[in-house]
């Protein structure tokens, strides 16, 4: 039997990042989704194209050898597939992990193979696989928990690849940047060894990679989007062509760099080179990366361990400067009532109906005694005053 991977989420990242590399590693990919349109398209199309875009031009790869199942209507089939799979991955968004966990729990419980399945969540969130594992354990019989490691091994990952908005007639085809990083911890696999996926960079300690990525790529990307949105820019590359926005982004990333080099064994030179690479990637006009796409879901992006409050809170605890990040937080708070983005409407409602104190707790999860609490509360009060 050939190798088989189950990929939850048939969206752009699922098809254009995860499945591309699983396919190249020789896996049959079984897509799982609840969106009829995506499943029907995958079932009726034997191949699709992934086009990697860079300043050097474009390179197109054809993806084949996949199937698709709708977990909403065919849950038992999904359970059977997980029962005989080598790998389970997902790219569904951190908020959806709790919804896919019950069927994964059933699939893991049904396994009889001697080698455990590798479970790797590919989400923009710290410890996403741990989060998924927690939900899976909640959906597993207590007397089966102690032996679960015989049936599944869970590894956290850090993913990095820009997937812009796709052309309206793209169908299953995905345009994606050429650059990527997919880093996964290898220690959970123990004596079984990690899956054979050449695109993955396997490491013993993932935390430095996750924090460096989240607090550089995601912080920089979102900062560019929110400042760009306030200035009426349509594309990320247009926003970074504005010298003032570019300077602000560099200032923000200087502050997060200080945190990263202080905490982890990453030198200032390594981090500076990483920042330059990231800003260059985001400035790529060929990606046609939309400001509103990058800015969407501001509530999640303003939460406690995310790209702004996460690094700013740690800097505040260390007595290091975080003023540039406060600027990003302010611009994120001003991303309100953007068409097609429910969270931006919810943000506007919270800021309108709550006091600055209530909104600070609700949006950021910061404790009142935290050194970042008062500065953020002041920014929230300022945004509320400007909105009146």
Curated annotation (Swiss-Prot):
Reactions the enzyme catalyzes: D-mannitol 1-phosphate + NAD(+) = beta-D-fructose 6-phosphate + NADH + H(+)
Q: What, per the annotation, is the impact of changing residue 213 to A?
A: Loss of catalytic activity
Catalytic residues (positions): 213
Identify one Gene Ontology CC term for this UniProt entry. Answer: cytosol
Q: Name one GO biological process term.
A: mannitol catabolic process
Question: EC no.?
Answer: 1.1.1.17
GO MF annotations, alphabetized: mannitol-1-phosphate 5-dehydrogenase activity; NAD binding
Residues bound to NAD(+) are: 5-16
Tell me the protein family, please: Belongs to the mannitol dehydrogenase family.
Q: How does it assemble?
A: Monomer.
Q: What does this protein do?
A: Catalyzes the NAD(H)-dependent interconversion of D-fructose 6-phosphate and D-mannitol 1-phosphate in the mannitol metabolic pathway. Has a strong preference for NADH over NADPH.
Name of protein: Mannitol-1-phosphate 5-dehydrogenase
Q: Which gene encodes it?
A: mpdA
